[in-house]
């Protein structure tokens, strides 16, 4: 998703390939492991929603959440947008403030992003609490969740690949954009739709508001409780003075919910032998890459960067001019002749690393810490012992997590365990399960998800998902009945070789095939039921 200045060199061929793929003539549609045009069959046998869908909650005001709001609002839904941060933008809202430091070892994935904060049991809502001093500051920071981008970060794709279709960039934009420019573009799109944080006249937007819990909603009837949607528990935190703040909890009911919280919320740090002892002994010297902001912090230090995906390579490159030396620890399989964006350390790129960046093997263990981190030792898988390390940055990625959906987490399951009801969406955090097209819960098709795939152009892909959700929930596009959805899901798992880290991976070709699927399905639906077509 992210990239620094060197990407202008190392990803040019990848981006050119993407543009070529986008502009090329459409090939005959090939289903990417889902089915043989299931939508033709679903006209006679389709899922029926148990209640009409009109009022929709969107969780998250990043690019995908804004795209969802734009489409659903245009389609006539009663849409509400909730964002924990102060402004829209998602991961493209940069601040010097860093997130709350992650625990080592990792927290359980179900609370990997945050621990839900619920009002005391039995209190009447709305319920308020007031805070002051350091408690207030830390509450605000934890509540809004500063994003994992750094000061010098630039986009890894040109503007035409990172834009909303109805709001193209001017033609004279540079090839790569500073994060601040893209952030302004996203906020401008929000303003155009009347959903920026300063659009105070819009009662349907709530910034500084975190969704703490999403649970089933029931209505009392003569025949007993009847399921009618979802109840959201909301917590809005606002500053009331220089060092004071207040939190207000409320609840609200919705017919459907869109999860647009992204994939970069719960940091992952591998559980390497001896690491916990180092983290306990040197807590300020071992961080996840989401804490990184400026390279000057590492001036004249010897730094160990762990991870060879985009963030690891580019953080190592960014700090190299300031650092004494940088070690980049990678798994051997990460060096290849591939030009894939999934292999940032291809052999063609190795020579472009700064002279003081040394690529080293994977870490085997951290030897028992001594009185100072620089006097302590790290053993690599090839037997090499590193000493003199003064800081460690784990650029080892993130895990899927939705703390507000505890009923859809089951971290006790492995990739090979059989599932039991309720079927989880999140297990170990490396992938998502039991979603149709990765956009709808199979058990609860009024629960939608935006842009949860890996290696996609989020702006473009989000618009197809938003149209799909709009048409499905408005009965202008059909999906198969739940039994058929489970059959398709089982086929997909089998074709993918089981669950795992790359279960949601699409890449350029996979994204192109999915867009063809959306186009064929949704345009067939438009011909049958009316509504706009997609292209």
Curated annotation (Swiss-Prot):
Induction per UniProt is: Expression is highly induced during artificial growth in symbiosis with Populus, which is close to its natural condition.
Cofactor(s) recorded for this entry are: FAD
E.C. designation(s)? 1.8.-.-
Q: Which SUPFAM superfamilies match?
A: FAD/NAD(P)-binding domain
Which of this chain's residues are annotated to bind NADP(+)? 307-312
Q: Which positions in this protein are listed as binding FAD?
A: 60-65
What is the stated purpose of this protein? Answer: Flavin-containing monooxygenase; part of the gene cluster that mediates the biosynthesis of the psychoactive metabolites ibotenic acid and muscimol. The first committed step is glutamate hydroxylation by the 2-oxoglutarate-dependent dioxygenase iboH, and the last step is decarboxylation of ibotenic acid to muscimol by the decarboxylase iboD. The order of the intermediate reactions is somewhat ambiguous. IboA likely activates the carboxylic acid at position 5 to introduce an amide bond, and the flavin monooxygenase iboF generates the N-O bond. There are several options for the latter step.
Q: Report the protein name in the record.
A: Flavin-containing monooxygenase iboF
- Provide the taxonomic classification: Eukaryota, Fungi, Dikarya, Basidiomycota, Agaricomycotina
